[in-house]
Amino acid sequence: MTDKRKDGSGKLLYCSFCGKSQHEVRKLIAGPSVYICDECVDLCNDIIREEIKEVAPHRERSALPTPHEIRHHLDDYVIGQEQAKKVLAVAVYNHYKRLRNGDTSNGVELGKSNILLIGPTGSGKTLLAETLARLLDVPFTMADATTLTEAGYVGEDVENIIQKLLQKCDYDVQKAQRGIVYIDEIDKISRKSDNPSITRDVSGEGVQQALLKLIEGTVAAVPPQGGRKHPQQEFLQVDTSKILFICGGAFAGLDKVISHRVETGSGIGFGATVKAKSDKASEGELLAQVEPEDLIKFGLIPEFIGRLPVVATLNELSEEALIQILKEPKNALTKQYQALFNLEGVDLEFRDEALDAIAKKAMARKTGARGLRSIVEAALLDTMYDLPSMEDVEKVVIDESVIEGQSKPLLIYGKPEAQQASGE
C-alpha cells in the first residue's frame, strides 16, 4: 500500500470507511481501489486491542501450570532444594488460582499467602523467584531490604518497590497487579533488640511496619512514569493484594535460636524433638524446624511474620550440588561459557577435575552458587582477552591446574604446526 493524496487523474480522494476527504485527514493510504485514513486505522487498532483484552483472561485461565509442572520447570534451573520447590509450587499455584477466581470461591474469601525463604547465601532463593516469574510470564522485580527506610527519612521508600514493578511492565497497572516482588536481605531489617527502644529504628522495625500494609494488600499511589509526588498530581492506583511477595534472607544465627528452643524442650511443631546438647543437628535440619516464635526472637515483629504464612527453608549447597549446578541446569554456567566461546568458533571443554576444583573453591569462600561465576571468569579471563586476536584455535581445555592458577588453558589448534609453535 502507498500513501496517496490524489490519484493520477487529480481527483479528490475519500476514505472508503468514514467518507472523509483527503483534506480532512492527515494521511490517506491507498489499496486496490480503496482508501483508508489514519483515523480509521487508529480506530481499528483500538477495536483489536479491546478484543484481545477480552480474549486474554480465557486464554490465561487454561494456561496456569499445575504444582507438578511448576516443580518440573524449577528442576530445569535449580539444583536440589526439593522441599522448598514443592512449597513454592503449591503456594504460587494457589495464589494465581485465587486471582483467576476473583479472590472468592462459593462466597468464601480466599486469603493471600506470601512466602518467606530462609537459607544461606548462594542457596538459590533469588533464582527460584526469578524462575517462577519467567515460567508464569508475569512482571518481576527485586528490592533490597537494606536500602529501605520509613517514608520521610533518607533512603528508599517502600512504595518505590511498586514503582519498580510498574517500570518493568511499561506502567501497565493490570500487568503489575499480577506480578511477583522479591525482597532480599529481609533478615537485615530485624529489630535491633527484643525490647522496644525509645529511639526511632527507621531501617529495622520501622521498615517492617511500613511493609506490613504493602505486603498484606493496599492501594498504593504511585506517581506516573517515575515522577516525584506532589499534591496536584494524578497517581496510578495499584492494588497490592494481587501481587505475590516473596521475602528472602540468610537469617545468620537463626539456627542457634531454634537449637536453644529445641534443646530446652519448647519445640512442638514440624516434628521438633528434644535433643541432647551432645546430639547436634545440622544447620539445615534446624532451619527446617523454624517456628514463628523463633523469627520473633530473631527480630521480626509478629504482625510481619503473620503476613508471610508460607515458610520454605533452603539448605546450604554441598560440593556435589555445586558440581551439578555447573553442568546440569538448562542455563548452567559451563553451558553459558561454551556458548560464548562458540560465538568465536571455538569449543570449550571443562574436565571433571576442573569442575571439582571450582566447587571446592566456592565451598572455601562460603559464597554458594553465587561465587561460581567469579571463579570461572578469573580462570578464563586471559583466554577471552587473547582469543579474538588468535587464529586457527579450535578448542580450549580447562583442567584443575587452570582453576588453581598453576597453568594456562590448553589451546588446541586446527593446524598442527600452529599448535607446535604455541607449545614451544
UniProtKB/Swiss-Prot annotation:
One Pfam family from the record: ClpB_D2-small
Protein name, per record: ATP-dependent Clp protease ATP-binding subunit ClpX
Residues given in the record as ATP binding sites: 120-127
Listed NCBIfam families: clpX, PRK05342.1
Disulfide partners: none
Similarity annotation: Belongs to the ClpX chaperone family.
An individual GO BP term: proteolysis involved in protein catabolic process
Subunit organization: Component of the ClpX-ClpP complex. Forms a hexameric ring that, in the presence of ATP, binds to fourteen ClpP subunits assembled into a disk-like structure with a central cavity, resembling the structure of eukaryotic proteasomes.
GO molecular function annotations of the record: ATP binding; ATP hydrolysis activity; ATP-dependent protein folding chaperone; protein dimerization activity; unfolded protein binding; zinc ion binding
Stretches assigned to the ClpX-type ZB domain: 2-56
Gene3D superfamilies: 1.10.8.60, ClpX chaperone, C4-type zinc finger domain, P-loop containing nucleotide triphosphate hydrolases
Residues noted as binding Zn(2+) in the record, renumbered to the chain: 15, 18, 37, 40
SMART domains: AAA, ClpB_D2-small, zf-C4_ClpX
GO cellular component: HslUV protease complex
HAMAP family: ClpX
Job of this protein: ATP-dependent specificity component of the Clp protease. It directs the protease to specific substrates. Can perform chaperone functions in the absence of ClpP.
Keywords: ATP-binding, Chaperone, Metal-binding, Nucleotide-binding, Zinc
Keyword Mitochondrion annotated: no
